[in-house]
């Protein structure tokens, strides 16, 4: 079995022959943006979301640090999308697939989409794709609310280490 979303996307692209250009230049353009998501966007937006929404106590330093980093990352994407219809160029790719889910919760990340007009246009275009809509519907149907301590413990595991001792 394969784990890690980036590895899964690469496997599926190789298996289907879709969403990853055959040309060396095109392939590495997609790969660099996939790595941008895996090494920067995903971890930073995840931390931003955690400290803004789920942290048991609000820590101003953490909220400000990750909100500012989120804004920087959205600016990077906005600049890239100024001259490109998709993240890695002219065609929809696994880079778009990797980045879109992390940006769906932009409201909870302290982001105003109007500040990133090229990103906003891309975000709306990707969100309008029929397959993306179907995927989002599945997620909405399966997602469980985190209203109680048990649900939060399952997601964040804050006491798991203590239980192992």
Please identify what each model-predicted range represents:
Residues 1-74, 78, 153, 163-165:
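GST-like domain detector, emphasizing the conserved glutathione-binding G-site
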Residues 8, 77, 96-97, 126-132:
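Residue-level signal for nonpolar/aromatic packing positions in well-ordered secondary structure
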Residues 13, 102-103, 136:
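Active-site-flanking alpha-helical
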Residues 18, 79-91, 131-135:
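Surface-exposed helix-capping loop/turn segments at secondary-structure junctions
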Residues 33-37, 70, 120-133:
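Short, mixed-charge aromatic SLiMs
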Residues 40, 45-49, 87-115, 120-128, ...:
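GST superfamily/GST-like fold recognition
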Residues 139-165:
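Acidic/histidine-enriched, glycine/proline-rich intrinsically disordered or flexible terminal extensions
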